[in-house]
Amino acid sequence: MDYTIEHVLTRKIAGFHLVGPWEKTVPQGFEQLSLWVDNFHIQPQAWLAVYYDNPQQVAPEKLRADTVVEVPADFTLPENSVGVILTDLPGGQYAVARARVENNDFGTPWLAFFTRLHQDVRYQMAARPCFEIYLNDGKRDGYWDIDMYIPVQTSGE
């Protein structure tokens, strides 16, 4: 899997923080997010899922993720945005790869990306969350095109 190393700016994000098995919580979170975006006429700059844990080290019921939209830096939450978080997604150096997800199998491209990145001795993972940006509406198109972001730092830092 090909990837690039990019400097990514901090993003302002709004949405829902979830805990539990990602294959259940993330789709439910996007349903909630879509309702909130529609009800409050939010104009998202991008749709993202943010992942805070390693599923090979954390039990499924404890996995943390956010389903969010990128919003302008001066965005404020509308009244009655129950359960919605507004926070920053840290910027910095990230390895970035594009993938097509079919049959809702998001795990396979992520595993391929991590495997490829671990082979690169120049970089190691940094202590920031991973995230993916959705480039299309997979419910409509039948597949998802995503950009995957893994935080990295130069080895030895």
Curated annotation (Swiss-Prot):
Cellular-component GO terms for this entry: cytoplasm
Matching InterPro entries: AraC_E-bd, DNA_gyrase_inhibitor, DNA_gyrase_inhibitor_GyrI, GyrI-like, Reg_factor_effector_dom_sf
GO molecular function, one term: DNA topoisomerase type II (double strand cut, ATP-hydrolyzing) inhibitor activity
Cytoplasm in keyword set: yes
Annotated localization: Cytoplasm
Any Pfam family the entry gives: GyrI-like
Entry keyword set: Cytoplasm, Stress response
Family: Belongs to the DNA gyrase inhibitor family.
Role according to the record: Inhibits the supercoiling activity of DNA gyrase. Acts by inhibiting DNA gyrase at an early step, prior to (or at the step of) binding of DNA by the gyrase. It protects cells against toxins that target DNA gyrase, by inhibiting activity of these toxins and reducing the formation of lethal double-strand breaks in the cell.
Subunit structure comment from the entry: Interacts with DNA gyrase.
Annotated protein name in UniProt: DNA gyrase inhibitor
